[in-house]
Amino acid sequence: MASQPDFTGRHAFVPSYSKRKSGVPYGDLVYKGRTYQQIIQQIHPTFDFRKHPFCHLDPDIYGVLKNTHAGWKPAFGQYEIPAKHLDGQGVDVGDVFLFYGMFRQTENLPDGTLHFKKGAPIQHIIYGYMVVSEILKDQDRIKELYPWHPHAASTEHPDNRLYLATDYGVFENRDSLLLSKPGQPNRRLWNLPAFCASSDVSISWQGKNTPVLVGGHAELNSACRGQEFVITAKTPELEKELRKWAESLIGHALA
């Protein structure tokens, strides 16, 4: 019988496939003793690895490469509209990225294979973070220092950059990381901390959608398109609340 990795209480974030003909193969990523290719073959048997052999490993905060490159550091890359949006929102050194994705509960079959649990919803869950320590925009340095990162192959874009961090991590699964409101089918309907419903808190990229206080949470029907939503507090009191929330997720005080 095949060995059964224990995913209890853990996230296995599977990066999307790369549109380029080069990059990190899914078979070069390892989690709990299995390659990502093996995991995907079980939960998504129709995925075509011949057509999409490479993944877009970004943000690279897991450290799941079989052969980690010398000098590996966590990095998150952006260019074009997302990069300009982050610049326009004033994102800089010291700011915190909270990474979220779509997750669905899995379970092991008796033969040891992994599959999605029947009826389990797809939910938005926060799975990791990084505190920006440097923003690298020199394209030659990106190629030289981070050759494994997908944005090392995007240096033709003048606004290409890497956000680097010394403080970063991947979370164990827990209720406080769930963004999607439980018990309903819309994964974009989020439960945020109550302070987010204040008119002095802004969440970028949401158009006319704003958080509304419902049952002790700020309920937001989050934008269906967009990658980076920047939360900004306009008063010292709300800035303190925002910081406290981030620290409660991360598990330690921010510098």
Feature locations, PLM:
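Contiguous surface segments at macromolecular interaction interfaces
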Residues: 1-38, 122-126, 135-255
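Short N-terminal edge-element motif at the start of the domain
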Residues: 41-123
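Conserved hydrophobic positions within beta-strands
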Residues: 130-132
